[in-house]
Amino acid sequence: MLEQIRGPADLQHLSRAQMEDLAREIRDFLIHKVAATGGHLGPNLGVVELTLALHRVFDSPHDPILFDTGHQAYVHKMLTGRSRDFDTLRKKDGLSGYPSRSESEHDWVESSHASSALSYADGLAKAFELNGHRNRHVVAVVGDGALTGGMCWEALNNIAASRRPVVIVVNDNGRSYAPTIGGFAEHLAGLRLQPGYERVLEEGRKAVRGVPMIGEFCYQCMHSIKAGIKDALSPQVMFTDLGLKYVGPIDGHDESAVEGALRHARAFNAPVVVHVVTRKGMGYAPAENDVDEQMHACGVIDPETGLATSVPGPGWTAAFSETLIELAAKRRDIVAITAAMPGPTGLSAFRKRFPDRFFDVGIAEQHAMTSAAGLAMGGMHPVVALYSTFLNRAFDQMLMDVALHKLPVTMVLDRSGITGPDGASHNGMWDLSILGIVPGMRVAAPRDGARLREELAEAVEVKDGPTAVRFPKGDVGEDIPAIERRDGVDVLAVPADGLSDDVLIIAVGAFAAMSVAVAERLRDQGIGVTVVDPRWVLPVPAAINTLAAAHKLVVTVEDNGGHGGVGSAVSAALRRAEIDVPCRDAALPQAFFDHASRGEVLAEVGLTERTIARQITGWVAALGATAGDRQVSESVD
């Protein structure tokens, strides 16, 4: 049946039995397709009936359907004509793992960062009103913990003050990656446990109003009493007191019930909250039995067992996790903070070992940062573990609440640089540019697991300001030994005998191994290369000035945007020191990159061993910088 669904209109003629069959078919499709490519499986298994109902009630794209935390949009993609492309999910030139404006007119926003859909909805509804579009509803599907983010409540405050037709669907599965925490989560849990008193009261209203003479008076008295009891006992008052209509809670796996609730909400023609209770991983035993994450995201797996088909090597996240636990065992002042991602950021083991020193603040990076500032003021040393891309959300708090007060807070930035399959919104290519302008900030970029352990230990010893440790996604690889350490800077390679100090390569973090390989290629071209790892890359160590002055060309290699990264900082440091050495950088262009593997993206932008070696050869030739004016081949193949 799924093959016959080319668009939402094809759902309108289906019977209830056919809808149930289609839901089962969609789940089976999701399990087998996502098992083959990797992706967000659990969240999408939980929204099958909800998404079917949305597309039967609303006229997409005339009525925009916005998915907060857009990893919930796989079923939406299937129902809008893209099921045939799921073999390419998250692959280069294939389907995005998130809504994508370039894919379909049904995708309004490139949504993947949480808590933003309601603000989009507020703006769209205002625009439709100003443009005279009277019969357009805006639907925002908010779930997977997004309502723990403060931006949602800022938007709700504005939406509630209007009469614009915004339908807010709360997909309540009690989770983000892990179980959702906080007061709001407890409110939703209370709503789930309520009996269907609204239905009973409605029957009572009809009966009382039917009594001759005194019926209306009795009804009004009953209504007043009911309102008082409801305000005292019902958690949904957090919505209704804002002026929002509330419908629910609804069984999110009963398509007919969800559809009825959505039609009811649509008829309000005003802001309304529809509370839908779903189960993440619904219908797939391996996901339902995954207590920690309900298979929120997975790599390539066996669809029958849910087990990974290959075992990855030791990863950066695991190395961080182990090291933090070792440090915390020695230091009672070390505490850990996550923004709803204990598993992905490596803090699950810390939570089990030190539950009283672990804080999951929900999807609230801004609060995480200022809460960390408070902890530091109180004598603790907070370690805030975030994906690099989510640091962007907490910049003001980092700058004004942490750095201005010179507080010892350590930020650990996982998924720095190019992450790949999750696309533009998840690349961590801005962190060095952001961190580099923060006064007093010290940034480490470990090249391997040994340096990660070393630099994290150094970071938590800093008492007079914030620190950050950044590393990429994936396997950590082999340790890369240093030839020597000069004033804190590790020297990884030096010119071969008989070659001059032609080029200084400053390798940032995980690009160290590639930089050493580049040096070997250039040696064969007669170019003498020194490769160094600054370890603490920002601010630029003083030893870099000394090393640069002894070479004819300085090249930085980094997986940050070229503007404002380590390359920019090195150039500025040399100018201030009046060291007149040409500087070049091999860095990411200032662009948003489509989803593809990390290797594919780096190859596309020229950050490979061969391309960098060829670039340096050309720069050296142009500068005439080789010893004795030797002729340098343009080819390093």
UniProtKB/Swiss-Prot annotation:
The keyword Transferase applies. Thiamine diphosphate binds at residues 71, 112-114, 145-146, 173, 284, 365. Its cofactor is Mg(2+); thiamine diphosphate. It is an enzyme of class 2 (transferase). GO terms for biological process: 1-deoxy-D-xylulose 5-phosphate biosynthetic process; isopentenyl diphosphate biosynthetic process, methylerythritol 4-phosphate pathway; terpenoid biosynthetic process; thiamine biosynthetic process. Mg(2+) binds at residues 144, 173. Homodimer. Belongs to the transketolase family. DXPS subfamily. This is 1-deoxy-D-xylulose-5-phosphate synthase. It comes from Mycolicibacterium gilvum (strain PYR-GCK). The lineage of its organism: Bacteria, Bacillati, Actinomycetota, Actinomycetes, Mycobacteriales. The gene is dxs.
